[in-house]
C-alpha cells in the first residue's frame, strides 16, 4: 500500500509543512487535509467530547476529511497545554470509527533533531542526516520569511488603494513559495515579493487606529476559527498586530517566558501555562505603546487564557485601554462576533477622538 501522509491545517503553515514532508519523504504522497470549512467543524464536533476545546474539533474534522481522501499516516503536533494529551484521544476516536492508519505525534517541548530524524527514517525517509538538517533549515527560513511578509500585510492591508491587491499578491506568494527547492530560490522569492508588496499603493493616515491580537495560538493563527477577525478589522482601516506566529512559538517563546514574567511582574507572579503568560505580557506592551485596544481570543474553556483574563482586566484599569474578549466553540455565532466587533470599533473611535 502506498503511504499517504496528511496533517491538519493551521493558517497558511500547510505550505512550509507540506514542502518539508515532500523533501523528507520522497517515496510517499504528501497532502494537507482539505481546507477548513463548516463541514470540518461539524465532523469534528460530531465525534468529539462536548466540552473539549475548539482546536481539538477542528483537527479531528481535518483528520476525518484527510482519511476519507486516502491518507494512511497522520501527523499531529502538541503544544504547551492539555492539547498535548489530545493525540491519544483523537487516535482512539478515529480507530473506533473504523479507520486504519498510523499516527505520529510530535510534542513542541520534546523535539530534538536526532529523534526527529530517526522517526522520519522509521516511516520511510531515505535522506542522510546532513540532507535532513539542510531541509529543516530551509523550512525554518521559509517560515520566517512567510511570517515577516504576513505581519507586513496585517499592518497595511486595511489601507490598500486597490481592493484585494494585497490578498491577490499574497496568494501568488504562497503558490510560488511551494516551488522553492534551495536557499537560492527561496531568497529570490523573498526579494521579489518584498519588493512587490512594497510597491502596492496604500493610503494610511497618520493617526490610524491600532489594535493588537493576543490569546491562544490556534484561535490566533487559524483565521476560520475566529471568523476571519483580522479581515474584519482591516475592513475598518485598522492596523492589526499579532505576535503569535510559528516563528515565535518555535524559536522565541521558550526563551522569553522568564523575560515576560519580569516585565509583567506587577500583574504576574508565576508562569500561567501555554500562551497565557504571553497574552498578559504582550497586552501590557501594547498598552505602553499606545495601542487603541486589544482583542483577546481563546477557545471556550481554555484554562491558561481564562487564568490570564483577571490580569488583562487589571491592565485595562491601569492603562485605560479597552480589551475585547472572545471565546469560540462550535456554537459561536458569526453575527454575534461581528456585532461585538462593530461596537468595539465605535468605542475606540470615540476614545481616539476624545484623546486627540
Give short role names for the model-derived ranges.
Residues 1-356:
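An N-terminal assembly and electron-transfer interface module characteristic of large anaerobic redox
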